[in-house]
Amino acid sequence: NIITGDDAAAGRYIEARLSNFALDVVFNPKTTEWKLSYDGRNKEPIALPVKFPLLLAQGAEGIAVGLNCKILPHNLGEICDAAIAYLHGQEFHLYPDFPTGGSIDVSKYNDGQRGGAVRVRAKIEKRDSKTLAITEIPYGKTTGTASKPSTFIDSILKANEKGKIKIRNVEDLTAAKAEILIHLTPVASSDKTIDALYACTDCEISISPNCCVIDDRKPCFLTVSDVLRNNVDTTLELLRKER
């Protein structure tokens, strides 16, 4: 769970079935390359030829053999608009869009390349003069569970211990959506506390992207715009094969 941090069920309990959308967009027997399964009795896809840049839509993160990758998620509608602009020979720009919400500063995004960075802020609301509510959290942070405490909430408690903010307690009411209530002390200012939360806790964080992908069986560093262009070109080839 991207909000609470709950782990997925064990692999032996998970079964996947392609939806009608996936059958149309992700899988096609005419364009899918196959190989023998581990025992040679069946065939399995080498890769599913997706007709849109799924990598940019859901993002990816990992590290292996001295290379690390961190591709941030993007809005599917904006990806489609950018693809249409590319087909028309027009300029386009792609910026991250996080499922956990919050606001984002993309001025140094650098098209997803190494050396770029984005700043992400939680959404903090005033419920009353002595109660603040965090309803959207920065991407990559979680509200935590009983077995996996939240470093996000811990950062608020530690700031209080150091005297950076003055709060009575933190109440986590997260369910389908994030909801963390921060109850202030009688002498605390809500406006100053919000400023301090952004300055001294994980309510504001910096994320550094690194668009490292496998292209032609070799790792390479691309921009997210390059990934989109490559995907559009590949999709055109797939559509020609389907005819």
Would you name each region that the model predicts?
Residues 5, 9-16, 20-21, 25, ...:
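C-terminal interaction appendages of subunits in large macromolecular complexes
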Residues 6, 39-45:
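Glycine-rich anion-binding loops of enzyme active sites
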